[in-house]
From Swiss-Prot:
UniProt subunit comment: Homodimer.
Residue window of motif 'HIGH' region: 39-48
Lineage summary: Bacteria, Bacillati, Bacillota, Bacilli, Lactobacillales
EC number, UniProt record: 6.1.1.1
GO cellular component: cytosol
Keyword presence, Zinc: no
Originating gene: tyrS
Domain S4 RNA-binding: 352-418
Stated name of the protein: Tyrosine--tRNA ligase
Binding site for ATP: K232
Keyword annotations from UniProtKB, A to Z: Aminoacyl-tRNA synthetase, ATP-binding, Cytoplasm, Ligase, Nucleotide-binding, Protein biosynthesis, RNA-binding
Catalysed transformations (reactions): tRNA(Tyr) + L-tyrosine + ATP = L-tyrosyl-tRNA(Tyr) + AMP + diphosphate + H(+)
SMART domains the UniProt entry points to: S4
Species this protein is from: Streptococcus pyogenes serotype M3 (strain ATCC BAA-595 / MGAS315)
């Protein structure tokens, strides 16, 4: 099975320009290819991971990746299938975000070894050197307005309004392809399926300006089996930056993937062989309640993104919280595992009587209910049941001198911080 056949078997090929020519190029020699990442935030997220891992697969097959950080295009904003124009960021912010994204990409691509080691480029380096007049003369003349208006990504915005700034975005992305081809002999661009219009602007410019053929391959935008856009947890993006989405939160995200999606996601997001995945699928279908596919998915992706130690920690947090063994976890581990739990910062004037604190921290709705909860054995401090109505919280209840975990019943948690 050649690399293109494997990508197809994994569900990673959505659309290509001349497929036969692309397969020929990928199977007959080394291809230099690029994927672009606009710094629209200070971190990449799971939605970027499909293209990143596809790039890694191609590198492992011997091809040479260029990771383009859009320091210039990030200042403009891509209109593709957006309902409204993005708010523009300052140059300083975009350049800062660009540097952070560069660091994240080095986790996935090999920038050190071999004749196909990855290269990082930033389109700010060339766009900052070209004048507006030169750009219109040397690039703009190759694009007709009719051609630009025909793009689906533009059509969807015409009725609501699109600025010239965003309208010109496709020409800028097209010029990226031309520049990388001219300087580095890059002949293939990879991106999400929503980028097709912008990407083919690059092949059009290559054809008209340099009489060369470029290839484009898009990866699918991933949705779950209900059609919901992939990569969000409770409406929030799942970030690759551990400070924005902890390894534990990422682990839980994969662990909660629906059965109908789990095997498909193993093909897309892991480097397990297709034979290994087929074996996992067989075991998974025989005992779905054991969630083997989800557990494997969580292990593989968290290890890939954050490393084996982070995976082991996420697994340990999961197991200890499930067992109620709060004291077996450090304060930092509890902050990860209970990040979505109500948090109350204890004030110096607060009463440390347990009944009072249950009301103050919003765990029980009233003192009467709080007393009943304590007497009925429904209140736990750091995993220990407390039934003393006169119990006073003390330093002994502080884990690592930072926090106390209170549980009411089986599932209602609150964290006291000091």
């Amino acid at each position: 099975m050649n690399i293109f056949e494997e990508l197809k078997a994994r569900g990673l090929v959505f659309q290509t320009t001349d497929e036969q020519a692309l397969v020929k190029a990928l199977t007959e020699g080394q291809v230099s290819y690029y994927t672009g990442y606009d710094p629209t935030a200070d971190s990449l997220h799971l939605g970027h991971l499909v293209a990143i891992l596809t790039s890694r697969r191609l590198q492992l097959a011997g091809h040479k990746p260029y990771a383009l950080v859009g320091g210039a295009t990030g200042l403009i904003g891509d209109p593709s299938f957006k309902d409204a124009e993005r708010s523009l960021q300052t140059k300083e912010t975009v350049l800062e975000w660009s540097d952070k994204i560069k660091g994240q990409l080095s986790t996935f691509l090999d920038f050190e070894n071999g004749d196909n080691k990855a290269e990082l480029v930033n389109n700010y380096d060339w766009f900052s050197q070209i004048s507006f007049i030169d750009f219109l003369r040397d690039v703009g003349k190759y694009f007709t307005v009719n051609y630009m208006m025909s793009k689906d990504s533009v059509k969807k915005r015409i009725e609501t309004g699109i600025s010239y700034t965003e309208f010109a975005y496709q020409i800028m992305q097209g010029y990226d392809f031309y520049e990388l081809n001219d300087k580095h002999n890059v002949t293939l661009q990879i991106g999400g399926s929503d980028q097709w219009g912008n990407m083919t602007a690059g092949t059009e410019l290559l054809r008209k300006k340099a009489d060369k053929t470029g290839h484009v391959m898009t990866v699918p935008l991933i949705t779950d089996s209900t059609g919901k856009k992939f990569g969000k947890s409770e409406g929030n993006a799942v970030w690759l930056d551990a400070d924005k989405t902890s390894p534990y939160e990422m682990y839980q995200f994969w662990l909660n993937v629906m059965d109908d999606d789990a095997v498909r996601f193993l093909k897309i997001f892991t480097f397990l062989s297709l034979d290994e995945i087929a074996e996992i699928e067989s075991q998974f279908n025989a005992a779905r309640h054991e969630r083997l596919a989800q557990k494997t998915l969580a292990r593989e992706v968290v290890t890939l993104v954050h490393g084996e130690e982070a995976y082991k920690q996420a697994l340990n947090i999961t197991e200890q919280l499930f067992a109620g063994n709060i004291k077996n976890l450090s304060a930092n581990e509890l902050k990860q595992g209970l990040s979505n739990v109500p948090n109350y910062h204890v004030q110096s004037e607060d009463s440390l009587n347990l009944v009072d604190m249950l009301v103050t921290a919003g765990i029980s709705p009233s003192k009467r209910q709080a007393r009943e909860d304590v007497q009925n054995g429904a209140i736990y401090i750091n995993g220990d049941r407390i039934q003393d109505l006169d119990y006073q919280l003390s330093n002994d209840d502080k884990i690592d001198d930072q926090l106390t975990v209170i549980r009411r019943g089986k599932k209602k948690y609150a964290v006291l911080t000091y």
